[in-house]
């Protein structure tokens, strides 16, 4: 169930679903697994807000365990494509593909709530049963290219070397807000709503 909020206007009352009301304040919620439908919704909202006013920041609240690499990279590419700065605010967690998205916010405008967590790791992949060896080799090569692409983005976003990111992402690597700040994925830990 999606909550509804009611606003008083000069013409009376107007009701909105909560996400439409937040969008009016340039807030986008990126929550749950990253998949194509969710990514398309986030991308549409980014494009809409940028077309509406590209001089005002967009606030992207992130709480995701990660998910589809292609869907996540579509979000990241759109964040970089639009003119408006995208502030990212991690609440709960940004894991896996979520770290790539959250760390791709505008430099100086990447935030995290005090009890949120970050997690980086190498991308996962697999082949279904009955897969031919040649197809397995192609899938393995693609997975290595994908890992390199993601680690390059994470290195650029954090200021760490590719070698360090590669080593740190070898297994699930959970980070507290303070550790995430020290690593360079965020710019500030927020204790209260001080966004402007």
Curated annotation (Swiss-Prot):
Its main location: cytoplasm. PROSITE patterns: CLP_PROTEASE_HIS (PS00382), CLP_PROTEASE_SER (PS00381). One of its GO terms (cellular component) is endopeptidase Clp complex. The active site is at residues 96, 121. It comes from the Bacteria. GO terms for biological process: protein quality control for misfolded or incompletely synthesized proteins. Its EC number is 3.4.21.92. CDD domains: S14_ClpP_2. GO terms for molecular function: ATP-dependent peptidase activity; ATPase binding; serine-type endopeptidase activity. Pfam families: CLP_protease. InterPro entries: ClpP (IPR001907), ClpP/crotonase-like_dom_sf (IPR029045), ClpP/TepA (IPR023562), ClpP_His_AS (IPR033135), ClpP_Ser_AS (IPR018215). Transmembrane segments: none annotated. It catalyses: Hydrolysis of proteins to small peptides in the presence of ATP and magnesium. alpha-casein is the usual test substrate. In the absence of ATP, only oligopeptides shorter than five residues are hydrolyzed (such as succinyl-Leu-Tyr-|-NHMec, and Leu-Tyr-Leu-|-Tyr-Trp, in which cleavage of the -Tyr-|-Leu- and -Tyr-|-Trp bonds also occurs). It is found in: Cytoplasm. SUPFAM superfamilies: ClpP/crotonase. Keywords: Cytoplasm, Hydrolase, Protease, Serine protease. Fourteen ClpP subunits assemble into 2 heptameric rings which stack back to back to give a disk-like structure with a central cavity, resembling the structure of eukaryotic proteasomes. Cleaves peptides in various proteins in a process that requires ATP hydrolysis. Has a chymotrypsin-like activity. Plays a major role in the degradation of misfolded proteins. Belongs to the peptidase S14 family. This is ATP-dependent Clp protease proteolytic subunit. It comes from Streptococcus pneumoniae (strain ATCC BAA-255 / R6).
């Amino acid at each position: 169930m999606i909550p509804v909020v009611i606003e008083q206007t000069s013409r009376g009352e107007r009701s909105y679903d909560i996400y439409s009301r937040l969008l009016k304040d340039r807030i986008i919620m990126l929550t749950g697994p990253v998949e194509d439908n969710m990514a398309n919704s986030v991308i549409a909202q980014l494009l809409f807000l940028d077309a509406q006013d590209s001089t005002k920041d967009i606030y992207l609240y992130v709480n995701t365990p990660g998910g589809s690499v292609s869907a996540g990279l579509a979000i990241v590419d759109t964040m970089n494509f639009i003119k408006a700065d995208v502030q990212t605010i991690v609440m709960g967690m940004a894991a896996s593909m979520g770290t790539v998205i959250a760390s791709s916010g505008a430099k100086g405008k990447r935030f995290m709530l005090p009890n949120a967590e970050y997690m980086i790791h190498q991308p996962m992949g697999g082949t279904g049963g009955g897969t031919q060896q040649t197809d397995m080799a192609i899938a393995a090569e693609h997975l290595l290219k994908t890992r390199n692409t993601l680690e390059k983005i994470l290195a650029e976003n954090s200021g760490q070397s590719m070698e360090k990111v590669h080593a740190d992402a070898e297994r699930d690597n959970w980070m507290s807000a303070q550790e995430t700040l020290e690593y360079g994925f965020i710019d500030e830990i927020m204790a209260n709503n001080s966004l402007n």
